[in-house]
Amino acid sequence: MKKLFVLCVCFFCSITAAGAALPDLKIEKLEEGVFVHTSFEEVNGWGVVTKHGLVVLVNTDAYLIDTPFTATDTEKLVNWFVERGYEIKGTISSHFHSDSTGGIEWLNSQSIPTYASELTNELLKKSGKVQAKYSFSEVSYWLVKNKIEVFYPGPGHTQDNLVVWLPESKILFGGCFIKPHGLGNLGDANLEAWPKSAKILMSKYGKAKLVVSSHSEKGDASLMKRTWEQALKGLKESKKTSSPSN
């Protein structure tokens, strides 16, 4: 049975009730040439988690910013755009966790170019996961010149977390680095570095018109400041926890 893709006007809650059937992949048009894709996966300890990524159109070419959680949803996403006359020219994964890289293996099998930083590929390899076909080491890397910039602000949610800047629309995809309501999964986080990295991001993209996070609502540039505040709070709490009792 063919599933309907819904163009929705608002984001879903980051975590929905566990045990319910997973919602279908969602696609939302943000503005001309920029779409948000939203996928869902049940994650142990977190329930059903919502994950946002982007699709950026450059003429008749389409670029995926993060894959959905699974190969199945990645294939659906690709087909949705192919059926509308677009060619998938490349994908970038913002960090090594499966909510950004879950579709890499399928994309590689379809000869769709996959990109990640060298650090992300190293972490994927250490985790026994399929790596992106192409990698880069630059702090700032143009996936498409003057259209799609990939930037490394420094460690935070993970050692390798990247953000993606769309200069024409002034949209920043902050991925899992942007955490305005709490830092979430800290399993691979660098709490010492996160506040400084957030400051770097604020300095570079403070004029962003719209900021898209992986797991929370979209908003304005204040999401970066709120992330910095959460990072400072998380660092202070971690130091209290690790301090020896008197």
From Swiss-Prot:
Its main location: periplasm. Transmembrane segments: none annotated. A beta-lactam binds at D99, K179, N185. The keyword Transmembrane does not apply. Residues 1-20 form the signal peptide. Its EC number is 3.5.2.6. The keyword Hydrolase applies. Its cofactor is Zn(2+). InterPro entries: Beta-lactamase_class-B_CS, Metallo-B-lactamas, NDM-1-like, RibonucZ/Hydroxyglut_hydro. Gene3D superfamilies: Ribonuclease Z/Hydroxyacylglutathione hydrolase-like. Belongs to the metallo-beta-lactamase superfamily. Class-B beta-lactamase family. Confers resistance to the different beta-lactam antibiotics (penicillin, cephalosporin and carbapenem) via the hydrolysis of the beta-lactam ring. Exhibits higher catalytic efficiency toward ticarcillin and piperacillin than blaIMP-1. Exhibits catalytic activity for carbapenem compounds, but has a preference for imipenem and ertapenem over meropenem. Has high efficiency for the hydrolysis of cefuroxime. Exhibits hydrolysis of all cephalosporins tested. Exhibits no hydrolysis of temocillin, the 6-alpha-methoxy semisynthetic derivative of ticarcillin. Monomer. Pseudomonas aeruginosa strains carrying this gene (identified by PCR) have been isolated from hospital patients in Italy, France, Argentina and Thailand. This is Metallo-beta-lactamase type 2. The lineage of its organism: Bacteria, Pseudomonadati, Pseudomonadota, Gammaproteobacteria, Pseudomonadales. The gene is bla-imp13.
